Design a protein with these regions (language model features):
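A short, small-residue-rich loop immediately preceding and capping a beta-strand
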Residues: 114-121
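Alpha-helix C-cap/termination motif
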Residues: 56, 112-113
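Conserved CoA-thioester-binding segment of acyl-CoA-metabolizing enzymes
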Residues: 1-69
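Glycine- (often His-adjacent) and acidic-residue-rich active-site loop
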Residues: 10, 34, 66-109
């Protein structure tokens, strides 16, 4: 019996993967080389994917997971938090030059999403 899920890429990103299949959206952190630590780009992409999943009437459930394992040591990590290597003295700076990490907006979207959200850790 084939248990492979036929995920289809919903949108291309650099720091996350975003796929859909049969009413389920899968958003995964995709920076295993840094234990899936997030940076401003990661949160911007996460917010964009969460908004898309919210607006897509064919989606009833959103899975949040992570890619891996780390190419350094083979260890799997869901997310290690903010990437301290890109954090400056003034905090995180987004691609637009604004000082922020904007993770609170991602948390708000998850909390108030009118669909089931599951962290696959």
């Amino acid at each position: 019996m084939n248990t492979e899920i036929p995920w289809q890429t919903a949108k291309q990103y650099e720091d996350i993967t975003y796929k859909k299949c049969n009413g389920v959206a899968r958003i995964a952190f995709n920076r295993p080389e840094v234990r899936n630590a997030f940076r401003p780009r990661t949160t911007s992409e996460l917010i964009d994917a969460l908004r898309d999943a919210t607006e897509d009437t064919s989606i009833g459930c959103v899975l949040i997971s992570a890619e891996g394992p780390s190419p350094k040591d083979g260890v799997w990590s869901f997310c290690s938090g903010g990437d301290q290597r890109v954090r400056g003295k003034q905090g995180y700076v987004g691609d637009d030059g604004a000082h922020r990490l904007n993770i609170l907006e991602a948390q708000r979207l998850i909390r108030f999403m009118p669909k089931v959200v599951i962290a696959v850790v």
